[in-house]
C-alpha cells in the first residue's frame, strides 16, 4: 500500500521514476525507513509492531516451489524480528509455523519486544528517498505488471479480492502498483533499460503480447479492457476499483 501511495503521489514529479516492481523490495531506502519508523512509533507508545504479509504461498503439487516459499518467508520474518517487530502475518496456513518459529526463537521466551525502542531518528526526507541503486525498467517487468493487473482485475470482477498469481497471494495493492507504474512509465515517456521509449504504440504492443498468453481465460476481455483503460487514460483514477464497480453484474 505504501509503495502504491508513493507512486501515485509522485507519478508526475520530475526526476522520480520507479523501476520494476520486483526491484522495490523492503530493503530499499524509503521502505526500510518506513518500517523502522513503524517499530519505533509503536514501541514508544507500548503498542505491538506487526510486520507485513509474506505473499509467498506453497504449492502442494510442486515441492521445489514450496521449498522456495518456505525459505523466502523464513528470511522475510527473520528480517522483521531482527528489526524489532513483535509478530507478523502470512498468506497461507502452511506458513504459520515458519513465521511462529522465527519469532519464538528471536524473542527467546518473551511475548514481544515492546521494551526495545530503537533510536532510528527517521527524518521526512528518508521516507521520500526513492533512489534505488542499479534499478531499471525491463520488458519482463512491463509484461509482468500487465499480466498481474489483468488477472487480478479478472479475479476481482468475479468476486475474489485476493488472487493466487504465480505462487504469490496478491491483493488490490499489487494490482495498484502494477497499474500506477505502467501509467507513470507511459505518461512520462520513460525509457526501458534497452533505450526503448514507452509510448502508446509500445504499450499497445506490450498489452497484445501479454494478452495472447491469457486470452483463453473465460470472460477475460472485460478485465483486459478495464485495466488497459486505467493505464492509458490521461486522468489517473485514485483507485482501480472505483470505475470497476460499474462492471460488476
Residue ranges and their predicted role:
Residues 1-249:
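Conserved alpha/beta-domain cores
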